[in-house]
């Protein structure tokens, strides 16, 4: 998977760097792990921290095993995912190392189905807190219609692609889908992936 390839790359190039893994799907849980819950006849993933910060060099195998154990089951509660990422970044040592959040997503932000403005706005607000703490946020969309082409202004862009730009550091001052601030990169900016 792309995430395991990323872990391999970081482990080889920067073994002292630390990586945490967060999954986002259904209800929010403050437990660390890969837990699920039942709702009627269906089983869903919690949105939770799967692995706390772990050294990439010595912990790569454990990190990759945690990623490989993840299976889709539930909505795309990106707001909860970004809130967990924000708590990790806020709790990380201020050791002068660059802090980065990479959000991989396969769908529209929601707690049920379709594009949910409330979930998108909460994810954008959490991302703003991450960016305000000096971290860079990258977004990677693996969904139909994903188009990370750099665009400024964001008029005429699908909600999902606009959202991906606003969560990313392309728009450092974005606080919601309607309060985007200006592009961090005038003239079009950078792509999300």
Question: Where do the language-model regions lie?
Answer:
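…and closely analogous acidic/polar surface helices at protein-protein or active-site interfaces
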Residues: 1-21, 115-120
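Soluble periplasmic/extracytoplasmic beta-strand elements of cell-envelope proteins
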Residues: 6, 18-23, 100-104, 136-138
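Surface-exposed acidic, glycine-flexible loop patches that form ligand/cofactor-binding
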Residues: 7-14, 86-97, 128-129
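Secondary-structure boundary/capping residues
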Residues: 15-19, 94, 176-177
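Short amphipathic secondary-structure patches
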Residues: 57-62, 91, 121, 125-128
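VWA/integrin I-like adhesion module and closely mimicked acidic/polar interface patches used
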Residues: 75-76, 80, 87, 98, ...
């Amino acid at each position: 998977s792309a995430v395991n390839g990323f872990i391999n790359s970081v482990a080889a190039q920067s073994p002292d760097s630390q990586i945490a893994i967060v999954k986002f799907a259904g209800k929010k849980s403050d437990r660390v792990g890969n837990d699920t819950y039942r709702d009627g006849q269906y089983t869903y993933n919690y949105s939770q921290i799967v692995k706390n910060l772990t050294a990439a060099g010595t912990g790569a195998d454990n990190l990759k095993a945690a990623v490989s154990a993840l299976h889709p089951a539930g909505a795309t509660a990106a707001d909860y995912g970004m809130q967990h990422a924000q708590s990790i970044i806020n709790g990380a040592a201020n050791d002068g190392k660059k802090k980065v959040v990479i959000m991989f997503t396969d769908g529209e932000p929601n707690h049920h189905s379709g594009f949910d403005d409330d979930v998108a706005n909460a994810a954008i607000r959490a991302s703003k807190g991450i960016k305000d703490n000096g971290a860079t946020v990258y977004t990677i969309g693996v969904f139909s219609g994903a188009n990370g082409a750099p665009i400024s202004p964001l008029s005429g862009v699908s909600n999902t692609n606009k959202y991906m730009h606003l969560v990313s550091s392309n728009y450092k001052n974005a606080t919601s889908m309607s309060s985007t601030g200006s592009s961090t990169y005038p003239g079009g900016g950078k792509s999300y992936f």
